[in-house]
């Protein structure tokens, strides 16, 4: 037998699990995620978080600021891995919390929860370094394929990693997508992971090479069609931790990786939503250098891309 609480205690010390335990954990979490819909319904009160990017010690600070599970209910909007030093430990902790408290934490897919992206931006190399092979990376990528695409809070606030798609007018069109796959290079699934808001009216090509830039008019139309009061997303660094877009303030970016890449100097935030559906933002900074460890083989510039 295994003890999830014991595994959580181990990983919270920024240690990673043996390969056979990690494989078992991935199998458990896949079964849980398979039962979730593409748009997972969540009830208030809930705390919504943006990108983490392997900044493990800052994730522990997030839980200190936002509240610990299971007393606090969470939605994390993807990008758990890459760029930070501890993607493995970060994603392992998320999986452990999902296995231990499946109804208290909702994990959305981000554009970095992908085989192609993680081979470029750090997670693949980190798994190779820590385990001496790519097996654990493969197990985690299989979990990525089952992460849900979005969440909706009290049927009124949509949470998604990137943004909107010109191919999606209704939430039902998201609900019928086949999500158990690598993120496609184009199309609605791709757009949900990659798109960004911009000060335009409609749609234009994204400089990222995937997804779209979308404007105020299409955001308002999408919100009206689907009876939404707010769209929350992550995907873009915000120096102040969060940012409302457009005159209607019907879209907000939440960013939860402070001092991103250990050099950007930004603060981070979490968005607390109670029954009133009025968001309250809690701002936090990166933990002090003396309260974190840095892998001896890592220079800071390696993951800043």
Swiss-Prot record:
Catalytic activity field: O-phospho-L-seryl-[protein] + H2O = L-seryl-[protein] + phosphate; O-phospho-L-threonyl-[protein] + H2O = L-threonyl-[protein] + phosphate
Binding of Mn(2+) 2, residues: 79, 111, 161, 235
GO biological process: cell division; G1/S transition of mitotic cell cycle; negative regulation of isopentenyl diphosphate biosynthetic process, mevalonate pathway; regulation of cell shape; regulation of TORC1 signaling
Broad class of the protein's primary localization: nucleus
SMART domains, alphabetized: PP2Ac
GO CC field: chromatin; cytoplasm; cytosol; nucleus; protein serine/threonine phosphatase complex
InterPro entries: Calcineurin-like_PHP_ApaH, Metallo-depent_PP-like, PPA2-like, Ser/Thr-sp_prot-phosphatase
SUPFAM superfamilies: Metallo-dependent phosphatases
Pfam families: Metallophos (PF00149)
CDD domains the UniProt entry points to: MPP_PP2A_PP4_PP6
Chain residues that bind Mn(2+) 1: 51, 53, 79
Subunit architecture: Interacts with sts5, ekc1 and mis12.
PANTHER family per record: SERINE/THREONINE-PROTEIN PHOSPHATASE PP2A-RELATED
Entry's family note: Belongs to the PPP phosphatase family. PP-6 (PP-V) subfamily.
Name assigned to this protein: Serine/threonine-protein phosphatase ppe1
């Amino acid at each position: 037998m295994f003890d999830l609480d014991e595994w959580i205690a181990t990983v919270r010390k920024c240690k990673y699990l043996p390969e056979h335990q990690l494989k078992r954990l991935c199998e458990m979490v896949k079964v849980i995620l398979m039962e979730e819909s593409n748009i997972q319904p969540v009830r208030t009160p809930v705390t919504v978080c943006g990108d983490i990017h392997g900044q493990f010690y800052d994730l522990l600070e997030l839980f200190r600021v936002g509240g610990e599970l299971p007393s606090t209910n969470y939605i994390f909007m993807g990008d758990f891995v890459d760029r930070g030093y501890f993607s493995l430990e970060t994603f392992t902790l998320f999986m452990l919390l999902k296995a231990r408290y499946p109804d208290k934490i909702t994990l959305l897919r981000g554009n970095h929860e992908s085989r192609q992206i993680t081979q470029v931006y750090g997670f693949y190399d980190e798994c190779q370094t820590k385990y001496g092979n790519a097996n654990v990376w493969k197990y985690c990528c299989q979990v990525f394929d089952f992460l849900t695409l979005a969440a909706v809070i009290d049927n009124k606030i949509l949470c998604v990693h990137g943004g909107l798609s010109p191919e999606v007018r209704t939430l039902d069109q998201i609900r019928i997508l086949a999500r158990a796959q690598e993120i496609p290079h184009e199309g609605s699934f791709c757009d949900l992971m990659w798109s960004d808001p911009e000060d335009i009216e409609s749609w234009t090509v994204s400089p990222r090479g995937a997804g779209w830039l979308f404007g105020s008019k299409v955001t308002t139309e999408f919100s009206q069609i689907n009876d939404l009061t707010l769209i929350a997303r992550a995907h873009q660094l915000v120096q102040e931790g969060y940012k409302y877009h457009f005159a209607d303030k019907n879209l907000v970016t939440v960013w939860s990786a402070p001092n991103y890449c250990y050099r950007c100097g930004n603060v981070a935030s979490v968005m607390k939503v109670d029954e009133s559906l009025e968001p309250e933002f809690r701002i936090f900074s990166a933990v002090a250098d003396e309260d974190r460890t840095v892998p001896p083989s890592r220079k800071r510039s390696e993951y800043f891309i």
